């Protein structure tokens, strides 16, 4: 449906920009790349304040996807300069916990805005965007004043062809396929579960929409508990258990 185009745009641009972002990061540094991602995200959240036309929302979600690609590609390497060893995996998982909270709250903030439960300044459901835009501004300011010593890469930056050639290694290829499957399940559950429940089980819209909320409740809980479990358990064993549960 038309509604499914918007979340798909976010991941489409991640597919396009992930490799070029890695090359950009090698040239300007990890911190500057993350700052750039936050600035692009800020722009994507600013546009809906001026309207909700179809074209404006397409541009907004495209910029959101580009910002997401820049951030996802550069944030983990940047964090590795601060957190090392066994704590890195748990710190990355805790970051997913924060992300899951944002995903869980988004539909409720939009609903509260649409029903005028919270002040919306005549934006209605679009009040969601300036709220998250403020969070982006805070992140930009805090990261900009934070001193991070980045490890310098030795040798020449990798070319686009060299990055693609990594898929020739079985481990890299299997990891790539695994990530695609995981993201597909995540996005598919989020966007299509309510529709399937309405069509197959005859549920009402409110009851079917709760399926998405239930998914994010357990995802949030899983990320939170996982961040602590990974401090005690081997990351490889934890990954195997998580894959089996999926």
Please tell me what each predicted stretch does.
Residues 150-175:
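Juxtamembrane intracellular "pre-TM" segments in multi-pass secondary transporters
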Residues 91-147:
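Helix-loop-helix hairpin linking two adjacent transmembrane segments in secondary transporters
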Residues 39-52, 244-246:
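C-terminal ends and interior cores of transmembrane alpha-helices
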Residues 60-97:
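Cytoplasmic helix-loop-helix junction between adjacent transmembrane helices
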Residues 168-213, 217-223:
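Extracytoplasmic gate region of multi-pass secondary transporters
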Residues 29, 50-55, 202, 234:
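Helix-breaking motifs and short loop linkers at transmembrane-helix boundaries and internal kinks
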Residues 5-23, 213-226:
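Central cavity-lining transmembrane alpha-helices of secondary-active solute carriers
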